[in-house]
Amino acid sequence: MEMAKEQELILVLDFGSQYNQLITRRIREMGVYSELHDHEISIEEIKRMNPKGIILSGGPNSVYEEGSFTIDPEIYNLGIPVLGICYGMQLTTKLLGGKVERANEREYGKATINAKSDELFFGLPSEQTVWMSHSDKVIEIPEGFEVIADSPSTNYAAIEDKKRRIYGVQFHPEVRHTEYGNDLLRNFVRRVCNCTGEWTMENFIEIEIEKIRQQVGNRKVLCAMSGGVDSSVVAVLLHKAIGDQLTCIFVDHGLLRKGEGDMVMEQFGEGFDMNIIRVNAQERFMSKLKGVSDPERKRKIIGNEFVYVFDDEAAKLTDVDFLAQGTLYTDVIESGTKTAQTIKSHHNVGGLPEDMEFELIEPINTLFKDEVRALGIELGIPEHLVWRQPFPGPGLGIRVLGEITEDKLEIVRESDAILREVIREEGLERDIWQYFTVLPGIQSVGVMGDYRTYDHTVGIRAVTSIDGMTSDFARIDWEVLQKISSRIVNEVDHVNRVVYDITSKPPSTIEWE
């Protein structure tokens, strides 16, 4: 991952903490660029990156376990400020000559510390609530260090070597439970590391455009466009950088939401004057999906067919050297560090063929999802597009449970459009993480007018979440739910019942398939 030399950087080294991405995000929220890297990064690479500061993350291991994660101690001699968090503090203590031992019992939860007003705690009250999560404890600090915070359970809640600008805290400042955690991190970034905080989406665009132009030159780029936020932002950024050297392929597999295909062509083809090839492949996809009910088989068929269609269209183009992808920083982190854990595979449409001889361009692979949205706004993409609902690669194919037919797709498409319209009218778009309708394949008896019906049931799924890893069902007002239900039953053919999913994640997932 190349990075402009003039850009201030805080380097976060990963020791397996569940909060490691949070550290990176907190730093970026301060206007300072931050990257998460494996703890085994070389001294030479650190020197090349030239960070203003280094943060050692927490982790689940003991520093005394066989094979426990460590770093090259030369890091402490680079003259770069270092902050160790939990495991990072214990490792620092051990490597610099202090003593660490296994605690009698793991300390987990809120604790109260008493802090001195030094650089790290500058401007903060002496007594504050923090979040502890550790099984080792420091019993003797290295030479040159002093205690800057203690607690009822430990004499060494925070330590510092002011001369070498090396710090350690036995709690997690990056989590919300730590009362002044953001302030502590800001003190480290601004006061200790002397960062100015000038990283913005505006200068990110300037830097990325220059990088794209240098990489591409006068050659051509191909972009697979789904109409989703990530690929749309990538396409607009590339178009801003290289104009007509970019060609986008938009595969319409017939599993899109109502009006989505036309919207992509109108907003991006006409609105941004981009060269987009729309491939109408509905019949091709539906013929492959005929008679298939198993969700994994459906997903695989849709993914494979997308690849084949894209490959066929790409083969018609000549002199294309680059392929652009909307890879996010979360994808890079999960695939790039030894401590990464894969929680759940995403609904990607599938990898592109290995024999496609393109160089990759991934201009947003240093950004988190919320940063991509901010980038989209800065690029001039309308807010209603930037804040569109997340949509899985297989599209409505996994929101029709069981076999997919045109009639079933129409029910989901129309009911989902009604749901989104009412949510928008009620001003709830930003309050609900994700919302959509599903067709669970259940028919039930109903009465419409003077006639008995035996028609489909539509399910509504709406959840609140911070990151999508866990979620709770949204507490939508009953009157709003009644409005949604009434409109669906009255406006969508062959539906006589609407149900609301009130299950959290876990145990269920957000999507039904």
Curated annotation (Swiss-Prot):
From the UniProt record, which GO molecular function terms apply? ATP binding; GMP synthase activity
Q: Which InterPro entries match?
A: Class_I_gatase-like, GATASE, GMP_synth_C, GMP_synth_GATase, GMP_synthase, GMPS_ATP_PPase_dom, Rossmann-like_a/b/a_fold
Pathway(s) annotated for this protein in UniProt: Purine metabolism; GMP biosynthesis; GMP from XMP (L-Gln route): step 1/1
What is the superkingdom listed in this entry's lineage? Answer: Bacteria
Task: Provide the reaction this enzyme catalyses.
Answer: XMP + L-glutamine + ATP + H2O = GMP + L-glutamate + AMP + diphosphate + 2 H(+)
Report if keyword Nucleotide-binding is assigned.
Answer: yes
Keyword Lipid metabolism listed: no
Q: Which Gene3D superfamilies match?
A: 3.30.300.10, 3.40.50.880, HUPs
Q: What is this protein called?
A: GMP synthase [glutamine-hydrolyzing]
